[in-house]
Amino acid sequence: MDLHQSATVRLLQEWCSHESPSGCRRHYNTRKKLKLIRVIGLVMGLVAVSTVPFSISAFTETYSQNNRGEASDVTGPRAAPGHRQRTLLDLNDKIRDYTPQPPASQEDRSENGTDHAQGDYPKDVFSLEERRKGAIILHVIGMIYMFIALAIVCDEFFVPSLTVITEKLGISDDVAGATFMAAGGSAPELFTSLIGVFIAHSNVGIGTIVGSAVFNILFVIGMCALFSREILNLTWWPLFRDVSFYIVDLIMLIIFFLDNVIMWWESLLLLTAYFAYVVFMKFNVQVERWVKQMINRNKVVKVTVSEAQAKASTAGDKEEPTLPNKPRLQRGGSSASLHNSLMRNSIFQLMIHTLDPLAEELGSYGKLKYYDTMTEEGRFREKASILHKIAKKKCQVDENERQNGAANHVDYAAEKIELPNSTSTEVEMTPSSEASEPVQNGNLSHSIEAADAPQATETAEEDDDQPLSLSWPSNTRKQITFLIVLPIVFPLWITLPDVRKPASKKFFPITFFGSITWIAVFSYLMVWWAHQVGETIGISEEIMGLTILAAGTSIPDLITSVIVARKGLGDMAVSSSVGSNIFDITVGLPLPWLLYTIIHRFKPVTVSSNGLFCAIVLLFIMLIFVILSIALCKWRMNKILGFIMFGLYFAFLVVSVLLEDKVLECPVSI
C-alpha cells in the first residue's frame, strides 16, 4: 500500500513539474483576486458607466415634459396623457382610489415639478436645492452602501439559513437550487418589487428586474468572456433548458403587459410557470439523458487498459458497483453536498449547481477542469483522459498493493465505461509537497492540495464554510475594508445567529426571518435614496431601476459568474446568468402583484409606463441576439463574444432611456 501511495504521489509531482507554478495554483489565485475591496471598486465602476444613460436623460428633459408631469399628477400617479388605454380610463381611476397617497406628495410636487411617483418616503433632511448643490453625493454613497449590505446579509446569513431549511426538509439539491437558493440570490430584486408596488407606487421594481435581467444576460456574459483565462467551450443542454423556460416566461409577460394592467389570474399563471420549472429541475437528469439518447446515435469506443491491469482492477474491485451507480457521486438529497458548497463565494452558487445533479465531484478525481458542468458522458471522457495520461506516464503499481487507492477507480472506470468519440480534455492537479500523505478513500484531492503549505492553509480557510468572524485583519488593505463594512456587519452579527456555528444551527428560524427583515430595510433605503437621486438629477424611478439598481442588485451574479468562468466553467457562467432571471420574472414580479390584488379585493395592478413594455420586448430581442452571438462564435466564449455583449448592453440602456423619456416612440405599443 505504501508503494502504491508513493507511486501515485510521484506521478502527480512529475506531471505538475511540467506545468508552471501559476498553472498548478490557478484556483487559489482566482479566489484571492476577488476581495471585497475589488467588489467595491467594481460597484463604483458600474456607477460611472451608468452615468451615460443619465446624461442622455438629463439632456432630453424639457419644459414640456415637466408640464406633462404636472398634468399627470392631476389625472393619476403614473398615467401620462396619450398613454391611457382606450378602454381602461374608468378602471385606472378606480384603482387609483384604492392606492394610498403619501401625505407629503403635494408639497414635494409643488417644489420639484417633476413626474416622479411620490411614494411613502420620509422627508429628506436636505432640500432639493441643497441636493443639487452637492448633498446628493451622500445619497449616492448610501445607495452603493446598500448594494454591499444586501450582498452581505444574503451571503452570510440568509443563504446559510436556507441551507439549514433544505437539510431539515430533505429537499434534493436541484429543487433547492431552483427554489430556496434562487430566492436567496434574488431577494434584493424581490423586495425592490414589493416596495415598488406597496410603498413607492411606481414601476421601480419592474424596471429593476428587467434591467437586472439584461445586465445578467449581456453584461455578465460579456465580463466572463473577457476575463476568462482561455476560450471556453459551451455545451448546449443547460443553455437550451434555461433559455427555453425563459422565452416562454417572457412571452407570457409581454402578453400580460399589452393592456397595462395585471389581473390576479395572470400573476397566478406566472407563478405556475415557476413551479413548472421547479418540477422540471426535479427530473432534469432523466430528461437530459433521454434527450441526448434520442439525439446522439454516435458510435462508442470502448476504453480499455492492458490485460494485466484490467485483471488486477477487476480482482481488487469486483465487489464495487459500476461507476455511474456509485452512491457518492449522486448529489440528489445529499444535505452534506448542499452544506459544503461554496456559498461564501456567492449567493447563487447552489442555483448554479442545478446545471447538473452530479456536479459536486470536483475534487474526487483531481482538479477536473470542466467536471462541474459535465453530464455523465462528459465525466466519462474526463476520466478516460486521466487514464490516458497515467498510461503515458507508465504508472505501474503492483496488483497486491492496489487496495482502495485512486488507481483502482481510474482503472476500473476505464474497464467498465463505454464512451462516445471525444478528444482529450485538460486535467488540472495541484502537486503535493508531502509524499507520505495518505490517499484517503480513493480520493486524490486529499494528497494533492498541499503544494504550498502557507498558501494551501490560507486557501483551505477561505474554502471552508466558516462562521462570520469580526477579528481584526493583519494587513492595511484588509483593515480598511473591515472598517468600511463594519457598520453593516456588526448589527447583523449582533441580531442574527450564525447558523454555520453548530451551537447556533437550531436558531435558523430567527436567522431566516431576521435576514428577511434586514433585506427589507436595506431594500427600502436603497429604493428611497435612488428615488432622491433620480428626483434631483431629473430622471424617473423606472430609469433608475433599469440602470443603477439593476446593476447594484446583480453584483453577486456578476462576481459568481466571473469566478466560475475564470475556473474554466463556461456553462455555469452562462446558464446561471439566464437561470437566475427565471426566478425574477416568474416570482419577483407576479408575487407582489398577486398580494396587491388579494389585499385590494382582486383589483388589477396598473403597470403603465412610457418605455417598460418596450424594454421587456427589447429584453426578449436581446435574448435572441445572445443565442445568435454564441452560435456565431461557434459556442465558444471568446473576446469577440464579450465585446458583442457589451455593445448590446449599452445599446439596450440608450434605447430604454430614450423610450422612457419619449424621445423615441415604442413601435410595439398599443
From Swiss-Prot:
Modified sites of kind Phosphoserine: S337, S341
Annotated localization: Cell membrane
Reactions it catalyzes: Ca(2+)(out) + K(+)(out) + 4 Na(+)(in) = Ca(2+)(in) + K(+)(in) + 4 Na(+)(out)
Tissue: Expressed abundantly in all regions of the brain and weakly in the eye, large intestine and adrenal tissue.
Chief location bin: membrane
Protein's job: Calcium, potassium:sodium antiporter that transports 1 Ca(2+) and 1 K(+) in exchange for 4 Na(+). Required for learming and memory by regulating neuronal Ca(2+), which is essential for the development of synaptic plasticity.
Official protein name in the record: Sodium/potassium/calcium exchanger 2
Gene: Slc24a2
